[in-house]
Amino acid sequence: MAGIYAVSIKGHASAIFNRQEKEISTGRVWEVMKKIMSLKPTRVIMSYSLLRSALDKSRQLTQEEYNIMQLILDGCVKTLEPVAASGICIDVNLGKCTKHTIPFGITNNDVGHVSVVMTLPFLEEGCYNIGACFDGRLSKSRSDASHYAVDVSLEIYLKSLSRDEAEEQISKGTSVYPFKINHPTYFEDETDTSDGESLSGRASSDDGPEDGGHGHGDKNNEKNSGKVVRKRKSRKEIDVGRFKMVKDNIINTRSGLLKSMRGTGHRKHRTQEITEGYNYGDKDAE
């Protein structure tokens, strides 16, 4: 069952290369370290104990627990953005090399750790330990090999919090990582979609009449509403209508002129001019 936790991390994670590397960001260092550890998962030691001071750390983490631990560390790196320390060092196996270290906190006493509040799925309260110390070669060609070494020692302590306790921690400046939003697949069993479906259905039915759309069950209402839905005319229909209106105006004008000229000597001549004009208009319209 999901719960709110205060995640406290102590320790460090270091990646060492025998080649001179340019200064890289903390996020990039962590991504490289995750990739290297995924190449040799059996060399990564993971254990759990209820208390930090407990000597028995024999219970090994399951693969799913380890995956969640990696996501927790991802969230802490993104949220806290600790500055990676880079420098030249001498390694027993690699010789002169470049070392990039992400400092999460000191491990001497119960101080110096970094903390983040987040909602997590089905994890026990207690201390999770991740350790790794090995070296290897990245490139396949021996003549152009890039050697590396990994040194990881992390202690991740989870403490369950009530909502009031979490809000108190946040008010004191503790950072928050939205784990549930960024990794929803771990919470699918707890997601209640009934409210969302009812809200979306209600929204569609409410918005239907306003924008002229058809919501569920709106067709019968439209039949009984007595409203006439006008079909939009095409451009061709509009042009034909305009021509008909002009034609009717010409006929009415001709009739009026014929009446006014009735009894004059110019009746025949004016009638012929008007008739020719009307025929010319019909020809253009065609």
Curated annotation (Swiss-Prot):
Keyword Phosphoprotein: yes
Compositional bias ranges of the Basic and acidic residues kind: 211-225
Region ranges (Disordered): 187-234, 257-286
Keywords linked to the UniProt accession: Phosphoprotein
Purpose: This protein is probably a component of the active polymerase. It may function in template binding.
Protein name: Phosphoprotein
Gene name of this polypeptide: P
